[in-house]
């Protein structure tokens, strides 16, 4: 506890605007789960203990002759206060202002833009964001924080006070002990947290697994029940959960530990706890979350596993142990092979790190594969939340490309819904006799994909096509040439050959029709010039007069859009214009003797094909003029 003398250097400061917004939303959105404030405060105390132990490896004087680190809870029913104290790393004045007056997270404004004023939805988002210390204001009308950083003089203590409104007060104090005391002045209707049994229940529920002892101040009574004094009593096991035998750990304990390491309110989808001995000696505890964090799509946001070395905390967000496409994984690695003075720089090119990364990646992919096979509904939840991120995998991790491909899910003409439930293995199991390729189509949306004219011949021949409508899909497929020995084939390519699924009579008729249509093709080429790479006849269409396609090695439409959206200069796509000789509009164009009118027909059909392929035209006015002039002749 703090010992305060004269209050000096006192100032009142305004909260960062995001803090005010978070406090307001949190108090209203999380009230139904208000007991989590104690979990958050004890979790912070545990982190402070971890940081002290780590820094004391190189600066043992930071222990100040007190290496027994722990958390203490005490309450005063008359005063209506609950105090959570720790003797961890503590804070100086700058730390207090930075950590208690602002939210030092990148993308904070983006996070708040996603809030909807729907309390149930916002509570999930706030839980993902991590409320930490601010959760105190769910139950407290005011909060005082007295703290001193380890290694600082007693007169370097700091006191921070706020009612959780627009501002806070910070001042210097004397504090003989290092660490932090958080004094909650509880609201009048929160007396339940001034009860020893209630506090014991909460600690048992949320904090049994942390690696430092939690003590509560209990009253001692004589034989007649009269109070004679008080003592500190430990109320948690204080053994790090991952060091215990798996058979002794309950499912509920694993879930609560996930909440502790991730600061996520939701339950994990699955987890894997492993002790490995041999060439490598380490323990890993990995979790797959059920909800994506608000900044999941930001590759630069902090992510990674907690790293311990010989049960000593080293760092949060150790990105070196998991590839970026698995950045949603949570948990920890405790290694006996890394040095205690390991730094992020040392981790970069360390052989032990590389071996641990390979093993943890394999473990994570195995967890996902097991979930996909054993619980399709749960895996679908995972895919909805994290599928976009997993699609980065084939480009990033060549050695595991086949495993990742097996975990991907897509829409398909087989089920004709936007739900991404079809695996590539599902598709392969339904391939027609003689089919050697996996056919796919990329588009801006599922609606655009399922209505694409490129699908007409596939539907007619009973061939399934994977429908891809996520922004990343074109890039994904450029990194995924095959699956199980079968090549992927984009159906928008000019050299697509489905002749093996046609009879000889049809082939002969098409050959004759193409020959008869040569002159029309040449006229169209002459009109369009270099606006297209080529003009050809096609017999793969049924209800559509024309399409545009690209050569096999030519950049496709979706890739060009992806590069443009990312700010890159993309070469212009060289389209091949394919016309259907059997369609009424094409026949009408072919019979047009007037070259000017013929040109308008070409503009009409090319414009339609470009709209179907790209969703837009470079020169809409030219297309509209051609349509209008043709309509005046009707």
From Swiss-Prot:
Q: Name one Pfam family in it.
A: HSP90
Q: Which UniProt keywords apply?
A: ATP-binding, Chaperone, Cytoplasm, Nucleotide-binding, Stress response
Q: Name the gene that codes for it.
A: htpG
For region C, the annotated ranges are: 562-634
Name it.
Chaperone protein HtpG
| Chief localization | cytoplasm
Q: Which organism is this entry from?
A: Photobacterium profundum (strain SS9)
The family classification in the record reads: Belongs to the heat shock protein 90 family.
Compartments, as annotated in UniProt: Cytoplasm
Q: Molecular function terms in GO for this entry? A: ATP binding; ATP hydrolysis activity; ATP-dependent protein folding chaperone; unfolded protein binding
Q: Where is this region: B?
A: 345-561
Assembly and interactions? Homodimer.
Lineage runs: Bacteria, Pseudomonadati, Pseudomonadota, Gammaproteobacteria, Vibrionales
